């Protein structure tokens, strides 16, 4: 059977998203479309950034990590499944960003500003907004007590219809929903060509092979832990089910990707 490259291997797949937006001009365009008021003109981009999270004793891989000349940190993550605890997931990524937001010897008031941005192909909160942004209140009963934590938790809804967004962001959200269309902008056509080039490359095959190995290792570990705890089936979900959400994110995200990508080979 001939593979339909446009069906499963879309821009919402983590490695594909990270690769396409590893190019500074693509990353800059995306950030400008999401945060036009910041006037971002340049930045250092690190796709699929690996950070060692000592608390969990494992490496954590970020989809798209960027820092501008003012020291602001931007972490953009594709979220393709509904989450039981989105707030915990934001907190988890925030804890990782905080590792880079204050250098040793700096005062607390020098802590960098961070933007954790989740992009969803569905409406995560069901209110129809294009963009949801969280706020921290020092007094839950007083909406005027918003704390300036220098953190921004932003959820972008590809299915949104309420609120104002840039035309560039709307183009990108339409691309997530519909793929390439006759109305797609030149930028969307460009990143779609880069997506196709990537999934036809040896680099993509190597990346997918690494994910397949990761899945195999996770299944083996799950079976081992499942036997130890007397579970009937030692599948990956069985292993992860009894742990905190913060301990799920790093590997489970990619395990899920491999499963979806494997379907595209059928």
Where are these regions (language model features)?
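His/Asp/Glu-rich acidic catalytic environments and adjacent acidic regulatory segments
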Residues: 159
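Short, charged alpha-helical interaction segments and adjacent helix-coil junctions
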Residues: 1-7, 15, 74-79, 166-266
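Conserved phosphate-donor/acceptor-positioning beta-strand/loop module used by diverse small-molecule
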Residues: 156
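Accessory alpha/beta interaction modules
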Residues: 1-152, 162
């Amino acid at each position: 059977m001939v593979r339909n490259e446009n069906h499963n291997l879309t821009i919402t797949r983590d490695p594909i998203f990270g690769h396409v937006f590893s190019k500074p001009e693509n990353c800059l365009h995306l950030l400008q479309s999401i945060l036009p008021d910041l006037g971002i003109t340049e930045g250092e981009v690190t796709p699929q950034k690996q950070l060692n999270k000592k608390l969990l004793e494992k490496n954590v891989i970020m989809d798209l990590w960027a820092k501008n000349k003012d020291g602001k940190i931007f972490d953009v993550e594709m979220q393709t499944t509904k989450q039981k605890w989105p707030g915990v997931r934001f907190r988890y990524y925030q804890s990782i960003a905080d590792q880079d937001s204050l250098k040793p010897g700096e005062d607390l008031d020098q802590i960098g500003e961070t933007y954790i941005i989740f992009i969803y192909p569905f409406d995560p909160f069901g209110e129809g907004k294009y963009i949801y942004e969280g706020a921290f209140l020092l007094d839950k009963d007083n909406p005027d007590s918003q704390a300036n934590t220098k953190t921004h938790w932003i959820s972008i809804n590809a299915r949104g219809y309420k609120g104002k967004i840039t035309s560039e962001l709307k183009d990108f959200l339409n691309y997530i929903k519909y793929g390439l269309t006759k109305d797609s902008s030149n930028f969307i056509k460009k990143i779609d060509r880069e997506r196709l080039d990537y999934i036809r490359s040896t680099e993509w095959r190597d990346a997918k092979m690494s994910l397949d190995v990761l899945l195999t290792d996770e299944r083996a570990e799950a079976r081992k832990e499942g036997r130890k705890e007397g579970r009937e089936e030692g599948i990956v979900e069985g292993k992860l089910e009894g742990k905190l959400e913060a301990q799920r994110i790093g590997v489970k995200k990619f395990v899920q990707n491999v499963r979806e990508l494997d379907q595209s080979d059928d």
